């Protein structure tokens, strides 16, 4: 299997579609095969009562909530479609990690050849069942996981009919 280079864009575009496109362009110029973003419905993954981490308070508006900050960083589904079209036009594969079930289902409508499970979702077995049901190959990061958690996740994906799982060994420090 050839090496595949994935450029991690995440939400580092700060909610700017133009910056996200620029990140894709630069990733392509640097030789990346794939550029990966994040897709989420913020209200489904962040509590309105969640506080920001101290470093976030120091580097962003300390008065806004975690949810308000996350809302600014995530694109609408329509913006993700535009971003994928841009990636296609410059010859780099678009990839996104969906953080909730509606985002999984949305990305599945885009005809992507691959989905990435977010690192923190490896123990969310109902979420993994939905991912498997999409019948799309997935990337499974394991940086925060025990061997038993990885085994359980692989079992759910296999039982659900996921056609291919690529395990990513990640050194993670969140």
Question: What label would you give each PLM region?
Answer:
Residues 16-17, 47-48, 76-80, 105, ...:
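Active-site-adjacent beta->alpha loops and helix N-cap segments on the catalytic face
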Residues 1-14, 54, 58-67, 81-82:
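N-terminal small/glycine-rich loop or linker at the start of catalytic domains
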Residues 60-125:
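Active-site beta->alpha loop and helix N-cap motifs at the rims of alpha/beta catalytic domains
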Residues 22-40, 110-111:
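Catalytic domains of carbohydrate-active enzymes, especially glycoside hydrolases
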Residues 33-74:
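Glycine-rich, proline-tolerant flexible connector loops at the mouths of alpha/beta enzymes
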Residues 5-9, 35-37, 94-97, 113-117, ...:
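Hydrophobic faces of well-ordered beta-strands that scaffold small-molecule active sites
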Residues 147-174:
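Catalytic alpha/beta core domains of metabolic enzymes, predominantly
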Residues 10-12, 40-42, 99-101, 120, ...:
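Active-site beta-loop-alpha junctions enriched in small/polar residues
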